[in-house]
UniProtKB/Swiss-Prot annotation:
Secretion signal, residue range per the UniProt entry: none
Protein known as: Large ribosomal subunit protein eL20
Subunit details: Part of the 50S ribosomal subunit. Binds 23S rRNA.
NCBIfam families named among the record's database cross-references: PRK00773.1-1
Keyword Manganese: no
Highest taxon listed in the record's lineage: Archaea
Species of provenance: Methanococcus vannielii (strain ATCC 35089 / DSM 1224 / JCM 13029 / OCM 148 / SB)
InterPro entries linked to this entry: Ribosomal_eL20 (IPR028877), Ribosomal_eL20_dom (IPR023573)
Statement: the UniProt record of this protein carries the keyword Ribonucleoprotein: yes
GO cellular component terms listed in the entry, alphabetical order: ribonucleoprotein complex; ribosome
Length: 76
């Protein structure tokens, strides 16, 4: 069964550190990390070494803040 994973972290190496929180509906935590590294690297042009993961947590459907993840959960 799929899990909802929230990843909190920051991007360093730019002019100012950027703090972020991302949510993913995935089967494993490692899948969520891979998607996050890919997304953040392509959108912000940073290397994986410049992305610091501060927290990884599994959350319930009621805790989801991302509207896209929420809509996909409502479909099933």
């Amino acid at each position: 069964m799929a899990k909802i994973i929230r990843i909190k972290g920051k991007i360093v190496g730019k002019d100012e550190p950027m703090v972020f929180s991302k949510e993913y509906n995935v089967l494993k935590e490692s899948d969520a990390l891979e998607i996050m590294y890919s997304d953040m690297g392509s959108k912000h042009s940073v290397k994986r070494a410049n992305i610091q993961v501060l927290e990884i947590s599994e959350i319930s459907q009621e805790e989801v803040l991302d509207p896209i993840v929420r809509k996909t959960l409502e479909m099933y």
